């Protein structure tokens, strides 16, 4: 069904994608491309973002994996800016391994906001079928949530959520 709705492009390492496909016994095939412009319709494509050997061990954080995740995110942002892709959907990242001199953000949502926001604020939306939840706060410790929520922040997030529901979801 997904291939009928869009042309999915994964940014990362084809070797890592193949490892996960094999480990999880997924019947999915993909094309390896250098840019989303080369992505084939009706087929999953992987944009090769690194030629480095990335060690993959499930549930074991690795700084090289963090570096690869940042590189993939940066390539997706670049191709979004170029108009090669319409949407960026991210998977969870390890917030500790991605931290570096150039990436000092609590999470990739804040990073994307800084790289693409032009001063606009982001909104994290979780959804399942017809159910959508928007988060008022981002990646902050639980002890800081109450002091971070203000009337102004709630209003700001509601305006963004309302616009997204109309523009992105046709509600």
Residue ranges and their predicted role:
Residues 103-142:
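Flexible loop/hinge segments that line or gate small-molecule binding clefts
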Residues 1-108, 149-171:
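Contiguous, glycine/small-aliphatic-enriched amphipathic segments in soluble metabolic enzymes
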């Amino acid at each position: 069904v997904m291939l009928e709705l869009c042309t999915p492009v994964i940014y990362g390492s084809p070797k890592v994608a193949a490892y996960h496909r094999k480990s999880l016994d997924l019947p999915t095939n993909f094309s390896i491309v250098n840019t989303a412009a080369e992505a084939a319709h009706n087929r999953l494509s992987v944009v090769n973002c690194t030629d480095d050997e990335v060690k993959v061990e499930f549930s074991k954080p690795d700084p090289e994996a963090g570096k690869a995740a940042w590189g993939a995110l940066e390539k997706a942002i670049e191709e979004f800016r170029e108009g090669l892709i319409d949407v960026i959907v991210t998977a969870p990242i390890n917030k500790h391994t991605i931290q570096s001199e150039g990436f000092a953000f609590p999470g990739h949502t804040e990073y994307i906001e800084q790289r693409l926001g032009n001063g606009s604020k982001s909104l994290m939306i979780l959804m399942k079928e017809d159910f959508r939840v928007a988060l008022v706060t981002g990646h902050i410790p639980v002890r800081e949530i109450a002091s971070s929520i203000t009337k102004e922040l709630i209003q700001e997030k509601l305006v963004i959520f309302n616009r997204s529901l109309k523009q992105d979801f046709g509600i």
